[in-house]
Amino acid sequence: MGVFLVYKPKLLFLGHHLMMSIRTSAHCISLFLMCCFSTAYAEVDLSKAWFNVGFYSAHFDTDKGLRNANPGLGIEYALDDKWRVTAGQFINSDNENSNYLGAYYQPWQVGDIKVGVVGGAFNGYPKAFNGGWFPAVLPVASWESGRVGLNVTFVPPLKDRLYGAISFQLKFRLKD
């Protein structure tokens, strides 16, 4: 009984943390979808919607035991040739749930590759802002062909709070 009482608060905390993470993710994705697909639009153009299943992060600090495969679920929606909005959730390099909400601005193009920045907010990194939301602006390059695309993002290291990496995000769309 004494062991149960010692661990019960931790279990309650972890359960609460998990539920808050799920609620936060649902709220972020719901807000994103409302903005993109509100009734102000007569029709949703699926050729502008890209879906991804997370990231692969090639970390600079290979000896830290970080998670390179970062599975998740996200959406990216093109507003025009330069602007896109994005939202999603993934398991980050610290093996925690992270959410993101942001926008891509890619004004330059070199051949088939668009170049610019992605800015927004992230959460879920225990050493960065106690796991809370924080802003980020990151350089990004994107390649798209038909129904397949790839975003490559440089994530700079942030002292002992966030580990640096080159992040690869494979994306798909349902319609050309």
What residue ranges belong to the model's regions?
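Hydrophobic, lipid-facing positions within transmembrane beta-strands of outer-membrane proteins
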Residues: A49, A69-L73, W83, N97-L101, ...
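Cleavable N-terminal export/targeting peptides
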Residues: M1-L46
